[in-house]
Amino acid sequence: MDNQSTINNNGNNKVQQKVRSACDACQSAKVRCGREKPTCRRCQNQGKTCVYSHARPLGRPRKSGSASSTTTMTTTTVNMNDLRDDAMIIAGSVNGDSEYGSPTRFRSISRVNNDHGMNMNMNNDWPGIPPLPSAGPRIPDILLDDSDENYMDMFMSVRLLGSLSGPSTVTDHHPLPPPEEEDGQEGYQNQHQHHNDPHSLIADPSAATEWDLGFPFDQHSSSESLSLEPSSAGAHPGDIPTSSLSKDGMDFTHTRGSQKISPNPHSIDSRTSSRDKSFNHHRSLSTLGSRTPNTTTTSSSASSVGLTGSSTTGFSRRFRGGGGGVLSLSRRRTECTCCDSMLQILAELDRHIADRSAISLDLIIKLEKETRAQTVAILHCDLCSQTFRPRILILSGLVLEAVVELLEEILHQHQLLGYSTATTTSNTTSSSLSSSLSSSSWIPSGPAGMELASPPPSIFDNNNTSTTTTTSSISTANRPGKTVDICSLWLGDYEISGPEKQEFLKHLLTARLRDIAATIHQLHETMNRYRHRPAFKVGTLMLGEIYRHVQAIVKTLDQ
């Protein structure tokens, strides 16, 4: 009876053995196990069969122990799936996105198999693990953010990186060929050493900046004669690239000592799709030829912007020759002259406004047509609209506002804003219409000297109860506006004057103002798509005020 109980007890002892708290997969990977049963979280995510083995005895095996226990302690079976998981953990730790440990912690995991005498170190050249990044200068993370809140931080980071000089080169973000054979391995090593030298990125304290405006403030800084046609391939002075180099998905544009930065989606996609390519991508250099400008420049201006004419030498050779590399826009972003053209229109408007002499009506109409055409071209330009440049869009709105101010001066000088053919039947009707018009949004805006001294008077006369055509007496002598020289109107040998001339001007200017309102509305809709950014939000509010101002004038003329 006692013997049977002993056997039962021995059997119970075999069944009720202790189970380890960590599963076999987590124990072999040396990571913390979630201890969920029957399947832990790690094994469930990786699709493995979770096994919780019995607890092994601690300490050294006894000499008198069985052979099975000795074999268990001295023999370790290498599971290739566990080794692959360990390699993935180390790769994630190197790249900084490991979910099992600290990004900066590098662990050496070894497996010893006494049967085969195999020793594997996971930090060696294990297949599938990308190499460690080089020790060269690292671009700050703030440069990867293109939001308006970080414009100043990005600008300071660019000044810390410094400005480099070099010939003009257009590069692409595809795998690049190796350096030329005639340069030899020595030149490639010199190139590598210069690229990883932090002293080659020292900022130039005398570098001029155009970061705040987004376009060249000084129009006389370059002596090139740029064409304004849309088919022209010449770039405006603010966006002339000098050389190209891609690093970590960023594009740098060199503009007379300053650098502009914008993310390149192609480089970012290539970095996320293939880490091996991204780790070695910044070591590659472009060998594409440089662009030849269409315009003729002097030697001094060409040297100031770094142009080399029709040179087709590889970029790597010029980089090793002593010049630094500067990053430019990719080939798909062709240079445009929208900003330069709009600045020329603004300069011409400013010159006519500052001039004390009278401005002719035909010149105002010409400037109005050029401004609207250039604004439409900017709205369809990929570089101006799709690359999130709010400054050129805000500049277009300001130029349109200046044109509206000149057209408004014509209306005031000929009393067209106070001229009405309204037919009233009672004082009540005219009073209600007058109150509704005065309550409409009238926002005077524009440069100094062109603002309205007071809101425009009502086009309805409260004292008029007859059905006759009346003309309100509006005094323009006290208004500090611009004098407009109206051209004569001739129909053959007959000169159109008097009320007929006023009706013609009213019809002409109303049509022009409606076209301007439609252009401003289209510009407002384009900027309203990116209203979450501060610069676009400010531009949207400004264009809304200009649009309401133009609509109020058109509504007054339609009465």
From Swiss-Prot:
- Cite the residue spans of the region called Disordered: 166-316, 453-477
Cross-referenced CDD domains? GAL4
Industrial and biotechnological uses noted in the record: Phomoidrides A and B (also known as CP-225,917 and CP-263,114) are potent inhibitors of Ras farnesyltransferase and squalene synthase. CP-225,917 and CP-263,114 inhibit Ras farnesyl transferase from rat brain with IC(50) values of 6 uM and 20 uoM, respectively. CP-225,917 inhibits squalene synthase with an IC(50) value of 43 uM and CP-263,114 with an IC(50) of 160 uM.
A molecular function (GO) term: DNA-binding transcription factor activity, RNA polymerase II-specific
* Listed Polar residues bias regions: 255-267
Keyword entries, A-Z: DNA-binding, Metal-binding, Nucleus, Transcription, Transcription regulation, Zinc
Q: Which residues bind DNA?
A: 23-50
Gene3D superfamilies attached here?
Zn(2)-C6 fungal-type DNA-binding domain
Q: Sorted alphabetically, which InterPro entries does this protein's record hold?
A: OAF3, Zn2-C6_fun-type_DNA-bd_sf, Zn2Cys6_DnaBD
Name where it's found.
Nucleus
Biased segments, Basic and acidic residues type:
268-279
Query: How is this protein annotated for GO cellular component?
Result: nucleus
Mark out the compositionally biased spans (Low complexity): 222-232, 286-316, 462-477
The record's section on SUPFAM superfamilies has: Zn2/Cys6 DNA-binding domain
Its job: Transcription factore; part of the gene cluster that mediates the biosynthesis of the antihypercholesterolemic agents phomoidrides which are dimeric anhydrides. Probably regulates the expression of the genes from the cluster.
Q: What is this protein called?
A: Transcription factor tstO
